[in-house]
Protein backbone atom coordinates (compact mmCIF):
# COMPACT_ATOMS: atom_id res chain seq x y z
CA UNK A 1 0.00 0.00 0.00
CA UNK A 2 2.90 2.37 0.64
CA UNK A 3 5.07 1.44 -2.36
CA UNK A 4 5.89 4.34 -4.72
CA UNK A 5 3.77 4.50 -7.85
CA UNK A 6 4.99 2.11 -10.51
CA UNK A 7 7.10 0.04 -8.13
CA UNK A 8 6.36 -3.49 -6.97
CA UNK A 9 8.01 -5.87 -4.54
CA UNK A 10 10.22 -8.49 -6.17
CA UNK A 11 9.32 -10.97 -3.44
CA UNK A 12 8.37 -11.12 0.23
CA UNK A 13 10.73 -12.66 2.78
CA UNK A 14 8.96 -14.07 5.86
CA UNK A 15 11.22 -14.79 8.85
CA UNK A 16 8.69 -14.46 11.67
CA UNK A 17 7.61 -17.04 14.28
CA UNK A 18 5.50 -19.89 12.87
CA UNK A 19 2.08 -18.42 13.71
CA UNK A 20 2.82 -15.36 11.55
CA UNK A 21 3.77 -17.26 8.38
CA UNK A 22 0.42 -18.00 6.78
CA UNK A 23 -1.34 -14.62 6.65
CA UNK A 24 1.40 -12.54 4.94
CA UNK A 25 2.31 -15.45 2.65
CA UNK A 26 -1.28 -15.99 1.56
CA UNK A 27 -1.90 -12.28 0.96
CA UNK A 28 1.32 -11.89 -1.03
CA UNK A 29 0.54 -14.88 -3.25
CA UNK A 30 -3.01 -13.58 -3.82
CA UNK A 31 -1.42 -10.30 -4.96
CA UNK A 32 0.89 -12.15 -7.35
CA UNK A 33 4.03 -11.52 -5.28
CA UNK A 34 6.53 -14.40 -4.87
CA UNK A 35 7.33 -15.55 -1.33
CA UNK A 36 10.38 -16.94 0.45
CA UNK A 37 9.19 -18.26 3.81
CA UNK A 38 10.90 -19.73 6.85
CA UNK A 39 10.06 -23.28 7.89
CA UNK A 40 7.88 -24.86 9.06
CA UNK A 41 5.63 -23.39 6.42
CA UNK A 42 2.65 -22.69 8.71
CA UNK A 43 1.25 -23.32 12.18
CA UNK A 44 -1.05 -26.18 11.15
CA UNK A 45 -2.04 -28.55 8.35
CA UNK A 46 -5.09 -26.58 7.22
CA UNK A 47 -3.00 -23.46 6.58
CA UNK A 48 -0.39 -25.51 4.71
CA UNK A 49 -3.02 -27.07 2.43
CA UNK A 50 -4.51 -23.64 1.71
CA UNK A 51 -1.08 -22.27 0.78
CA UNK A 52 -0.43 -25.14 -1.62
CA UNK A 53 -3.79 -24.52 -3.27
CA UNK A 54 -3.34 -20.77 -3.76
CA UNK A 55 0.30 -21.03 -4.91
CA UNK A 56 -0.63 -23.59 -7.55
CA UNK A 57 -3.72 -21.66 -8.62
CA UNK A 58 -1.87 -18.36 -8.97
CA UNK A 59 1.31 -20.00 -10.36
CA UNK A 60 3.60 -17.77 -8.27
CA UNK A 61 7.15 -18.77 -7.19
CA UNK A 62 7.36 -19.96 -3.59
CA UNK A 63 10.52 -20.97 -1.73
CA UNK A 64 10.73 -22.60 1.69
CA UNK A 65 13.93 -21.60 3.48
CA UNK A 66 15.67 -24.94 3.90
CA UNK A 67 19.02 -23.21 3.57
CA UNK A 68 21.18 -26.34 3.73
CA UNK A 69 19.93 -27.41 0.31
CA UNK A 70 22.02 -24.51 -0.96
CA UNK A 71 25.31 -26.21 -0.10
CA UNK A 72 27.03 -27.38 -3.29
CA UNK A 73 27.96 -30.59 -1.49
CA UNK A 74 24.29 -31.26 -0.64
CA UNK A 75 23.47 -31.09 -4.34
CA UNK A 76 26.47 -33.25 -5.17
CA UNK A 77 25.25 -35.79 -2.59
CA UNK A 78 21.81 -35.79 -4.21
CA UNK A 79 23.37 -36.59 -7.58
CA UNK A 80 25.37 -39.49 -6.15
CA UNK A 81 22.38 -41.09 -4.42
CA UNK A 82 19.63 -40.46 -6.98
CA UNK A 83 21.78 -41.63 -9.89
CA UNK A 84 22.06 -45.02 -8.20
CA UNK A 85 25.77 -45.01 -7.38
CA UNK A 86 25.05 -46.41 -3.91
CA UNK A 87 22.48 -48.90 -5.19
CA UNK A 88 19.15 -49.46 -3.50
CA UNK A 89 18.88 -47.40 -0.31
CA UNK A 90 18.55 -49.52 2.80
CA UNK A 91 19.07 -47.11 5.68
CA UNK A 92 19.29 -43.35 6.29
CA UNK A 93 20.30 -41.61 9.52
CA UNK A 94 19.46 -37.91 9.30
CA UNK A 95 20.05 -35.89 12.44
CA UNK A 96 20.17 -32.32 13.72
CA UNK A 97 21.65 -31.83 17.18
CA UNK A 98 21.91 -28.63 19.22
CA UNK A 99 22.38 -27.78 22.88
CA UNK A 100 21.01 -24.27 23.28
CA UNK A 101 17.79 -25.37 25.05
CA UNK A 102 19.54 -27.53 27.65
CA UNK A 103 18.58 -24.94 30.28
CA UNK A 104 15.15 -23.37 30.87
CA UNK A 105 14.58 -20.47 28.48
CA UNK A 106 11.44 -18.48 27.74
CA UNK A 107 11.33 -18.46 23.93
CA UNK A 108 8.48 -18.52 21.41
CA UNK A 109 9.60 -21.89 20.03
CA UNK A 110 8.32 -23.71 23.13
CA UNK A 111 4.90 -22.02 23.08
CA UNK A 112 2.21 -24.05 21.24
CA UNK A 113 0.38 -20.85 20.29
CA UNK A 114 3.36 -19.55 18.32
CA UNK A 115 5.22 -22.76 17.38
CA UNK A 116 2.46 -25.32 16.79
CA UNK A 117 2.51 -28.96 17.92
CA UNK A 118 6.29 -29.36 18.12
CA UNK A 119 9.27 -27.27 19.15
CA UNK A 120 12.30 -29.43 18.35
CA UNK A 121 10.66 -31.40 15.53
CA UNK A 122 9.23 -28.33 13.85
CA UNK A 123 12.28 -26.13 14.34
CA UNK A 124 15.09 -28.49 13.31
CA UNK A 125 13.58 -31.95 12.77
CA UNK A 126 12.06 -30.62 9.56
CA UNK A 127 15.57 -29.76 8.35
CA UNK A 128 16.70 -33.35 8.96
CA UNK A 129 13.62 -34.60 7.09
CA UNK A 130 14.30 -32.26 4.17
CA UNK A 131 17.92 -33.41 3.89
CA UNK A 132 16.69 -37.01 3.80
CA UNK A 133 14.08 -36.35 1.11
CA UNK A 134 16.29 -34.09 -1.02
CA UNK A 135 19.44 -36.22 -0.98
CA UNK A 136 17.72 -39.58 -1.47
CA UNK A 137 14.71 -38.62 -3.58
CA UNK A 138 12.62 -40.81 -1.27
CA UNK A 139 9.58 -39.95 0.83
CA UNK A 140 8.58 -41.03 4.32
CA UNK A 141 5.39 -43.12 4.30
CA UNK A 142 4.94 -44.04 7.99
CA UNK A 143 6.47 -42.93 11.28
CA UNK A 144 6.91 -44.29 14.78
CA UNK A 145 7.90 -41.26 16.83
CA UNK A 146 8.59 -39.94 20.30
CA UNK A 147 8.44 -36.21 21.07
CA UNK A 148 10.02 -35.82 24.49
CA UNK A 149 10.41 -33.04 27.04
CA UNK A 150 13.75 -33.31 28.82
CA UNK A 151 13.68 -29.93 30.60
CA UNK A 152 10.89 -30.07 33.16
CA UNK A 153 7.98 -27.69 32.75
CA UNK A 154 8.10 -27.19 29.00
CA UNK A 155 4.86 -27.58 27.04
CA UNK A 156 6.62 -28.77 23.86
CA UNK A 157 9.37 -31.23 22.96
CA UNK A 158 13.06 -30.44 23.13
CA UNK A 159 14.10 -33.94 21.96
CA UNK A 160 12.62 -35.66 18.89
CA UNK A 161 13.03 -39.13 17.39
CA UNK A 162 11.17 -40.64 14.42
CA UNK A 163 11.74 -44.11 12.97
CA UNK A 164 10.51 -44.01 9.37
CA UNK A 165 9.45 -46.31 6.56
CA UNK A 166 10.61 -45.07 3.15
CA UNK A 167 8.85 -45.00 -0.20
CA UNK A 168 11.20 -47.51 -1.85
CA UNK A 169 9.52 -50.25 0.17
CA UNK A 170 12.31 -51.83 2.18
CA UNK A 171 14.22 -48.69 3.18
CA UNK A 172 14.18 -47.40 6.74
CA UNK A 173 15.35 -44.12 8.27
CA UNK A 174 15.92 -42.45 11.59
CA UNK A 175 15.11 -38.75 11.72
CA UNK A 176 16.34 -37.38 15.02
CA UNK A 177 16.69 -33.93 16.49
CA UNK A 178 17.73 -32.61 19.86
CA UNK A 179 18.07 -29.16 21.40
CA UNK A 180 19.34 -30.36 24.78
CA UNK A 181 22.53 -32.09 23.56
CA UNK A 182 25.22 -29.98 25.23
CA UNK A 183 28.32 -29.61 23.07
CA UNK A 184 26.44 -29.71 19.78
CA UNK A 185 26.12 -26.32 18.09
CA UNK A 186 24.52 -26.74 14.66
CA UNK A 187 25.19 -30.40 14.01
CA UNK A 188 23.09 -31.35 10.98
CA UNK A 189 24.24 -34.44 9.14
CA UNK A 190 23.10 -37.31 6.97
CA UNK A 191 24.36 -40.84 6.41
CA UNK A 192 22.89 -42.78 3.48
CA UNK A 193 23.57 -46.52 3.37
CA UNK A 194 22.93 -48.35 0.11
CA UNK A 195 23.61 -51.88 -1.07
CA UNK A 196 26.86 -50.73 -2.73
CA UNK A 197 28.16 -48.14 -0.28
CA UNK A 198 27.57 -45.31 2.18
CA UNK A 199 27.57 -41.51 1.84
CA UNK A 200 28.23 -39.17 4.77
CA UNK A 201 27.74 -35.37 4.80
CA UNK A 202 28.02 -32.97 7.76
CA UNK A 203 26.78 -29.38 7.84
CA UNK A 204 29.55 -28.30 10.21
CA UNK A 205 32.09 -29.62 7.70
CA UNK A 206 30.25 -28.74 4.47
CA UNK A 207 33.19 -28.64 2.08
CA UNK A 208 33.33 -32.39 1.50
CA UNK A 209 31.36 -35.59 0.95
CA UNK A 210 32.65 -38.95 2.23
CA UNK A 211 32.02 -42.17 0.30
CA UNK A 212 32.63 -45.66 1.70
CA UNK A 213 32.52 -48.60 -0.73
CA UNK A 214 32.76 -52.24 0.25
CA UNK A 215 36.25 -53.55 -0.46
CA UNK A 216 37.59 -50.23 -1.79
CA UNK A 217 39.57 -47.34 -0.29
CA UNK A 218 37.51 -44.62 1.36
CA UNK A 219 36.89 -41.57 -0.84
CA UNK A 220 36.51 -37.91 0.08
CA UNK A 221 35.30 -35.44 -2.54
CA UNK A 222 36.11 -31.78 -1.87
CA UNK A 223 34.08 -28.97 -3.35
CA UNK A 224 35.68 -27.45 -6.45
CA UNK A 225 38.81 -29.58 -6.20
CA UNK A 226 39.29 -31.91 -9.13
CA UNK A 227 35.92 -33.70 -9.05
CA UNK A 228 35.75 -35.45 -12.41
CA UNK A 229 33.55 -38.16 -13.94
CA UNK A 230 34.73 -41.69 -14.70
CA UNK A 231 37.10 -41.86 -11.72
CA UNK A 232 36.10 -45.41 -10.89
CA UNK A 233 33.05 -44.30 -8.90
CA UNK A 234 31.53 -41.15 -10.35
CA UNK A 235 29.95 -41.27 -13.78
CA UNK A 236 28.66 -38.36 -15.86
CA UNK A 237 28.14 -35.25 -13.74
CA UNK A 238 25.22 -32.87 -14.49
CA UNK A 239 26.33 -29.79 -16.40
CA UNK A 240 24.32 -27.45 -14.17
CA UNK A 241 25.97 -28.90 -11.06
CA UNK A 242 29.48 -28.47 -12.44
CA UNK A 243 28.65 -24.97 -13.69
CA UNK A 244 27.29 -23.86 -10.31
CA UNK A 245 29.37 -20.87 -9.17
CA UNK A 246 31.64 -21.63 -6.22
CA UNK A 247 34.74 -19.98 -4.84
CA UNK A 248 38.11 -21.78 -5.14
CA UNK A 249 38.66 -24.84 -2.98
CA UNK A 250 40.38 -23.93 0.29
CA UNK A 251 38.41 -20.69 0.58
CA UNK A 252 35.76 -22.09 2.90
CA UNK A 253 32.13 -22.02 1.90
CA UNK A 254 29.58 -22.27 4.70
CA UNK A 255 26.11 -21.12 5.78
CA UNK A 256 26.14 -17.69 4.12
CA UNK A 257 27.20 -19.21 0.80
CA UNK A 258 24.42 -21.79 0.99
CA UNK A 259 21.93 -19.04 1.81
CA UNK A 260 23.16 -16.91 -1.10
CA UNK A 261 22.89 -19.88 -3.48
CA UNK A 262 19.34 -20.55 -2.29
CA UNK A 263 18.35 -16.93 -2.93
CA UNK A 264 20.08 -16.86 -6.31
CA UNK A 265 18.22 -19.95 -7.51
CA UNK A 266 14.90 -18.60 -6.24
CA UNK A 267 15.57 -15.18 -7.73
CA UNK A 268 16.19 -16.75 -11.15
CA UNK A 269 12.64 -18.10 -11.00
CA UNK A 270 11.34 -14.74 -9.76
CA UNK A 271 12.96 -12.95 -12.74
CA UNK A 272 11.48 -15.48 -15.14
CA UNK A 273 8.06 -15.02 -13.54
CA UNK A 274 8.31 -11.23 -13.79
CA UNK A 275 9.22 -11.54 -17.47
CA UNK A 276 6.30 -13.86 -18.16
CA UNK A 277 8.61 -16.78 -18.87
CA UNK A 278 8.35 -20.37 -17.57
CA UNK A 279 9.95 -21.15 -14.22
CA UNK A 280 10.48 -24.50 -12.50
CA UNK A 281 10.05 -24.16 -8.72
CA UNK A 282 10.16 -27.97 -8.80
CA UNK A 283 12.12 -28.71 -5.63
CA UNK A 284 15.41 -29.49 -7.37
CA UNK A 285 17.15 -26.22 -6.41
CA UNK A 286 15.21 -25.21 -3.31
CA UNK A 287 12.26 -26.48 -1.28
CA UNK A 288 8.84 -25.49 -2.61
CA UNK A 289 5.33 -25.17 -1.21
CA UNK A 290 4.63 -28.91 -1.46
CA UNK A 291 7.79 -29.62 0.50
CA UNK A 292 6.36 -27.30 3.13
CA UNK A 293 3.16 -29.33 3.29
CA UNK A 294 5.17 -32.55 3.65
CA UNK A 295 7.05 -30.99 6.56
CA UNK A 296 3.79 -30.14 8.32
CA UNK A 297 2.42 -33.62 7.59
CA UNK A 298 5.56 -35.09 9.16
CA UNK A 299 5.25 -32.96 12.31
CA UNK A 300 1.61 -33.92 12.75
CA UNK A 301 2.12 -37.63 12.03
CA UNK A 302 4.99 -37.70 14.53
CA UNK A 303 2.95 -35.86 17.17
CA UNK A 304 0.04 -38.27 16.66
CA UNK A 305 2.39 -41.25 16.88
CA UNK A 306 4.03 -39.95 20.04
CA UNK A 307 0.65 -39.43 21.70
CA UNK A 308 -0.10 -43.08 20.82
CA UNK A 309 3.17 -44.22 22.48
CA UNK A 310 5.07 -44.59 19.21
CA UNK A 311 2.38 -46.38 17.18
CA UNK A 312 3.05 -46.59 13.45
CA UNK A 313 1.25 -43.64 11.86
CA UNK A 314 0.83 -42.96 8.11
CA UNK A 315 1.95 -39.67 6.63
CA UNK A 316 -1.01 -37.49 5.55
CA UNK A 317 -1.18 -36.62 1.85
CA UNK A 318 -2.66 -33.62 0.10
CA UNK A 319 -6.43 -33.92 -0.45
Model-derived segments and spans:
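Contiguous beta-strand/loop segments that form the cofactor/metal-binding neighborhood of enzyme cores
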Residues: 123, 127-217, 223-225, 250-277, ...
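C-terminal lid/capping helical subdomain adjacent to the catalytic/cofactor pocket in oxidative enzymes
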Residues: 289, 293, 307-319
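Glycine-rich phosphate/pyrophosphate-binding loop
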Residues: 220-249, 253
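A short helix->loop->beta-strand "cap" motif at the edges of active sites that frequently abuts
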Residues: 31-33, 58-60, 169-171
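Beta-loop-alpha module in the N-terminal Rossmann-like domain of NAD(P)-dependent dehydrogenases
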Residues: 1-54
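Aromatic/hydrophobic pocket-lining residues that form π-stacking "cages" and hydrophobic walls in ligand
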Residues: 24, 51, 77, 301-302
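Predominantly a Rossmann-like dinucleotide-binding segment in NAD(P)-dependent oxidoreductases
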Residues: 61, 68-155, 160, 209, ...
Amino acid sequence: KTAPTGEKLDYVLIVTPNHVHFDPAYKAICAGIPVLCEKPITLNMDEAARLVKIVEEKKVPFCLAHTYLGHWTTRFSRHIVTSGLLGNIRWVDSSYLQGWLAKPLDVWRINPKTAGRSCCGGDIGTHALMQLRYVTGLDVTEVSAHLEIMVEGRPLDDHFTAYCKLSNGNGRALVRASQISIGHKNDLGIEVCGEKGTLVWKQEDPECVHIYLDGQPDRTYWRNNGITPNDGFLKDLPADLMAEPTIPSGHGEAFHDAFARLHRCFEADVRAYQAGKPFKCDGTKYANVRDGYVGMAFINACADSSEAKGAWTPMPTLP
